[in-house]
UniProtKB/Swiss-Prot annotation:
One of its GO terms (biological process) is positive regulation of transcription by RNA polymerase II. Keywords: Acetylation, Cytoplasm, Metal-binding, Nucleus, Repeat, Repressor, Transcription, Transcription regulation, Zinc, Zinc-finger. This is Flt3-interacting zinc finger protein 1. The modification N-acetylmethionine is found at residue 1. GO terms for molecular function: receptor tyrosine kinase binding; RNA polymerase II-specific DNA-binding transcription factor binding; transcription coactivator activity; zinc ion binding. May be a transcriptional repressor of NRL function in photoreceptors. Does not repress CRX-mediated transactivation. The gene is FIZ1. Widely expressed. It comes from Homo sapiens. PROSITE patterns: ZINC_FINGER_C2H2_1, ZINC_FINGER_C2H2_2. The keyword Metal-binding applies. Residues 250-280, 378-412 are annotated as: Disordered. It holds the Pfam family zf-C2H2.
Length: 496
C-alpha cells in the first residue's frame, strides 16, 4: 500500500500588526498613539495646568475638569438622580449619591474587611480604628501559589526585592506574587491581569498600580503609616521622597551634625559596614555648602520604593550626588530664596557659610556677617556699635593682608532708631523709616491710592494701562512683574 503523503498544514494567518505607538513618555516610559494623549498623560508628571477659569483664575490640567468647575459659578447641575430630585455638577457626585438609594458599600477596609458607602467614611474609619496598621494577608485567588506573611517594611510577599526579606513566592506581579502585594486581593489581581489593567487595586479609592510596592506606599496615605524616619531629628514621613527632601534641610547645620554617610547604615551596622557603600562616592558627594534643593515637577504619582530602601533596614539611603541639572531646574536655598542657576545659589550661600571673621569682644562668638554680629551684640549684650565690630573684624584679618571673601563689601552700618534694623546705605534707611511713620507720599492720579515707595506706584500704574513689560518668550503672554512671569514659566516647565 502506497504511503499517502501527509497533508501540509495550512499556513497560519499573519498576526495582526501591533498598532504604532510612536509617542513615548520620558518620565515613566509609557507609549501613546497620538501626541494629544501624551500631552494629557504628561500633565500627571508636571504641575502644568493650562486650562484656566476665566472667572476666578484657577487652573486645571484637563478641559473637562474646567467644565465641571465652571458649573460651580453658574449653578448648573445637569446630572439628576432618578430616585430623588437632587442634581449634581458631575457624574462622580451622582454615582456617590446613588449608593444612598441602592445600599451598596463599594469601599472596603483591607484590615477588618468592613465596607462603607463613601470614601470619606472609610477614611474616618482607618484613622480612628487602624491608624498605622497594615492589612493582614488574605487568601490567594484561584491558580495562585500559597503565600507567606508580607514583609514588615514594604508589605511584599515572597523574596523581597526591596528590603532583602524572604518568603514563599517569587517573581513580580500576580503570576509570581513575589514582589507585589499579592496578599491584598489576589483574586482581583488575577482578574485585572486578564483585563489588561494594573493588577493591584486599592480598596479605599480604587486606584490601581502595576506593582505591590507602589500599592504599599499608596496605602500609607490612607492609614497615616509613616515608616521612614529621619536619623537626625526623628521626624516621620510616609514616602521616601519626602524624607529625602527633608534631609536637605540638615545640610547647613554645620560640622557638628551627624555625617550624611550615616543615613545609609541599616540597623546593627557598624562603622565599617556603614562606610562601605559611601567611601567610593565620597569624592563625588556635594559639600554641605553646595547642597541644593532641586524642585522637580509636582504630581508625579506614588513614589516607588524599589531602590530607595537599603537591604536590611527601613531607612532611606544617603542622597547620591545630584545629576547635572537642566537649565529649567530651580535651585532653592534653605532660607527660602530661589535661584535659576547653581552659580547664583553658590554666590548666595556665601552669606550662610562664609568665613567667620567678625568676633564678639564679650563672649568670643564668631560670625560671617557684620549684621549677624551686631544683632548678637544687641540681643545678648544689650549694645550695638558697628564701628567696634568692624575694628574687631580688621584685627582678625589674615597676616598676609588679604581681605577675607566678602568681608569688605555690603556692610550694614546704618541703623533704624525704632527697630534697630541695619541697612547698607542712608537711602535704604530712609525708605525703611516710612514703615514706622506710615507716610505714603506717592499718589496714583487714576484711582487716588497712595503708596509708600515710588516703585510700588509705578507697578500699580501698570494695572491702569495695557503695558506688560515682562512677556513670556514661549506663549507671548505679558505680565506686570517679574515674579508673575516666573510663576507663569513654571507652567511651561516640563513641556518643552
Amino acid at each position: 500500500m502506497d504511503d499517502v503523503p501527509a497533508p501540509t498544514p495550512a499556513p497560519a494567518p499573519p498576526a495582526a500588526a501591533a498598532p504604532r505607538v510612536p509617542f513615548h513618555c520620558s518620565e515613566c516610559g509609557k507609549s501613546f498613539r497620538y501626541r494629544s494623549d501624551l500631552r494629557r498623560h504628561f500633565a500627571r508628571h508636571t504641575a502644568l495646568k493650562p486650562h484656566a477659569c476665566p472667572r476666578c483664575g484657577k487652573g486645571f490640567k484637563h478641559s473637562f475638569n474646567l467644565a465641571n468647575h465652571l458649573r460651580s459659578h453658574t449653578g448648573e447641575r445637569p446630572y439628576r438622580c432618578s430616585a430623588c430630585p437632587k442634581g449634581f455638577r458631575d457624574s462622580t457626585g451622582l454615582l456617590h449619591h446613588q449608593v444612598v438609594h441602592t445600599g451598596e458599600k463599594p469601599y472596603c477596609c483591607l484590615v477588618c474587611e468592613l465596607r462603607f458607602s463613601s470614601r470619606s467614611s472609610l477614611g474616618r474609619h482607618l484613622k480612628r480604628q487602624h491608624r498605622g496598621v497594615l492589612p493582614s494577608p488574605l487568601q490567594p485567588g484561584p491558580g495562585l501559589p500559597a503565600l507567606s506573611a508580607p514583609c514588615s517594611v514594604c508589605c511584599n510577599v515572597g523574596p523581597c526585592s526591596v528590603c532583602g526579606g524572604s518568603g514563599a513566592g517569587g517573581g513580580e506581579g500576580p503570576e509570581g506574587a513575589g514582589a507585589g502585594l499579592g496578599s491584598w486581593g489576589l483574586a482581583e489581581a488575577a482578574a485585572a491581569a486578564a483585563a489588561s489593567l494594573p493588577p493591584f487595586a486599592c480598596g479605599a479609592c480604587a486606584r490601581r498600580f502595576d506593582h505591590g510596592r507602589e500599592l504599599a506606599a499608596h496605602w500609607a496615605a490612607h492609614t497615616d503609616v509613616k515608616p521612614f524616619k529621619c536619623p537626625r531629628c526623628e521626624r516621620d514621613f510616609n514616602a521616601p521622597a519626602l524624607l529625602e527632601r527633608h534631609k536637605l534641610t540638615h545640610d547647613l547645620q554645620g560640622p557638628g551634625a551627624p555625617p550624611a554617610q550615616a543615613w545609609a547604615a541599616g540597623p546593627g551596622a557598624g562603622p565599617e559596614t556603614a562606610g562601605e557603600g559611601t567611601a567610593a562616592e565620597a569624592g563625588d558627594a556635594p559639600l554641605a555648602s553646595d547642597r541644593r534643593l532641586l524642585l522637580g515637577p509636582a504630581g508625579g504619582g506614588v513614589p516607588k520604593l524599589g531602590g530607595l530602601l537599603p537591604e536590611g533596614g527601613g531607612e532611606a539611603p544617603a542622597p547620591a550626588a545630584a545629576a547635572e541639572p537642566s537649565e529649567d531646574t530651580l535651585y532653592q536655598c534653605d532660607c527660602g530664596t530661589f535661584f535659576a542657576s547653581a552659580a547664583a545659589l553658590a554666590s548666595h550661600l556665601e552669606a550662610h557659610s562664609g568665613p567667620a571673621t567678625y568676633g564678639c569682644g564679650h563672649c568670643g562668638a564668631l560670625y560671617a556677617a557684620l549684621a549677624a554680629l551686631e544683632e548678637h551684640r544687641r540681643v545678648s549684650h544689650g549694645e550695638g556699635g558697628g564701628e567696634e565690630a568692624a575694628t574687631a573684624a580688621r584685627e582678625r584679618e589674615p597676616a598676609s593682608g588679604e581681605p577675607p571673601s566678602g568681608s569688605g563689601r555690603g556692610k550694614k552700618i546704618f541703623g533704624c532708631s525704632e527697630c534697630e534694623k541695619l541697612f547698607r546705605s542712608p537711602r535704604d534707611l530712609e525708605r525703611h523709616v516710612l514703615v514706622h511713620t506710615g507716610e505714603k507720599p506717592f499718589p496714583c492720579l487714576e484711582c487716588g491710592k497712595f503708596f509708600r515707595h515710588e516703585c510700588y506706584l509705578k507697578r500699580h500704574r501698570l494695572l491702569h494701562g495695557t503695558e506688560r513689560p515682562f512677556p513670556c518668550h514661549i506663549c507671548g503672554k505679558g505680565f506686570i512683574t517679574l515674579s508673575n512671569l516666573s510663576r507663569h514659566l513654571k507652567l511651561h516647565r516640563g513641556m518643552d
